[in-house]
Amino acid sequence: MGNGVQPLDPVAIQIGSISVKWYGVIIASAVVIALLLALSEANKRKMDKEIIVDLLIWAIPISIISARIYYVIFEWDFYKNNLGEIVKIWHGGIAIYGALIGAVLTAIIFSRIKKISFWQLADVVAPSLIIAQAIGRWGNFMNQEAHGAETTRSFLESLHLPDFIINQMYIDGAYYQPTFLYESLWNVLGFVILLIIRRTKIRRGELFLGYVIWYSFGRFFIEGMRTDSLMWGDFRVSQALSLLLIVLSIGIIIYRRLKMNPPYYMEDKFGKVVKKK
């Protein structure tokens, strides 16, 4: 590059003509960490860990496919003339909301087949989902995508960011806002909050709904800073969906508390309180 700033190599491993990109490595790492955390949460909740493994065997590939389909739908003007690019997810282009939709639908169907509580499953995996999203954003970082508007190097330095982040935000002759980082840090904070509130007297399902509210709230504002938002006419799709999910989640919490009296989070499926560890 003209000013000597070099981006990080997006390729993690090169074996002959076969290359493994950091994007894929980071996404795979996020999945593994999410699985291990979900198994740990299941153990605390006295839930059979095989249920979590069986769920994720289905949910992971379906979520990846739905995330890609979601992205392709809203970028169809490009993909209709580049059909071969649709399967090349290592080039980037998977939407978190698409993945969430796929995961929720899978969990609903799975819970009905297994005759277990969807809300109990959702609560167990909620911390895993948000930390996986925090990690996954670094895949966007390696691909130099999901960034914000143009800015200056001095502004990035004022944030006390390490040089490797600042340099990676230098794209095509300009520096950009590291919105990937803002969202990653927001998700890490959300992860910590979920771990704290799961020990309080919340009702079953509210940990997952709290995750949806927290993530959607942050995503709404961060999305407004991005330059690569998926659009539907004049609307940013993720902002519209964020508002919808916030309202829907709050409405579900209120309705369930008023009409359904759901059990507390720390009660297992037999109604017994699980001892806190």
Curated annotation (Swiss-Prot):
Broadest EC class assigned to this enzyme: transferase
GO molecular function annotations of the record: phosphatidylglycerol-prolipoprotein diacylglyceryl transferase activity
Keywords associated with the record: Cell membrane, Membrane, Transferase, Transmembrane, Transmembrane helix
EC number, UniProt record: 2.5.1.145
Principal location listed in the UniProt entry: membrane
Localisation per UniProt entry: Cell membrane
Entries under PANTHER family matching the protein: PHOSPHATIDYLGLYCEROL--PROLIPOPROTEIN DIACYLGLYCERYL TRANSFERASE, PROLIPOPROTEIN DIACYLGLYCERYL TRANSFERASE
Purpose of the protein: Catalyzes the transfer of the diacylglyceryl group from phosphatidylglycerol to the sulfhydryl group of the N-terminal cysteine of a prolipoprotein, the first step in the formation of mature lipoproteins.
Family note: Belongs to the Lgt family.
Protein name: Phosphatidylglycerol--prolipoprotein diacylglyceryl transferase
The species this protein was found in: Listeria monocytogenes serovar 1/2a (strain ATCC BAA-679 / EGD-e)
